[in-house]
Amino acid sequence: KNSVICEMLSMYLPSFGADTVRKNISKLAGQAGKEVASEIVNLVEDPEGLNARSFDDEGTPTIKKYLIRDGILGEYLYNQAEALLAGKSSTGNGFKSSYRSVPAIGVTNLKLIGEEKSREMLIEELQDGLYITACDGMFAGADPVSGDFSLISKGYLVKNGKLDRAVNQIAVAGNFYDMLKHIRGIANDYLVTGGAGGIFEAPSVSVGELVVSGK
């Protein structure tokens, strides 16, 4: 469901930052310009969205940029400090969490671009599987460095392309970076979450290669 995807984007956003890449604690290190996701995946930061900003908190102009375009990883996100270390220009991603804090790497509006299909169409195409509506303990059950996650979830079984019975207390395990490569479909049912520290906008997606246990 879209709400789960928004949570995951928030959790794994730091992996796109130049700071985690420099420290070698990002699985995306060394992957710029390479295929890191399904070709239908387009992840864009748009400073003209709900959290509109013409400049970041360091005075650098913000620009629209693709973190992932057609499955290919774009440039990493830089604030002024990381840009100086790398000999590059800031990408306009230096933001403060409070007026006392040092600018860290963040985003304005991060959006996973959907396709022209409804959530119901995704479920119909899935035929048999699981429609996950909520996950508990995202920050406890997900590792932002390795990408591994194991989350207590709930939702509905999908049978013959339709929602069947509800399921609760099931465990869903996988890896975020592997999941990106196995996205089969993206809906158009956008949900917007977040606030002044960054907006996350995503629709529901259809994913393969996850491990499910429970009833």
Mark where each language-model region is:
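N-terminal small-residue-enriched
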Residues: 1-215
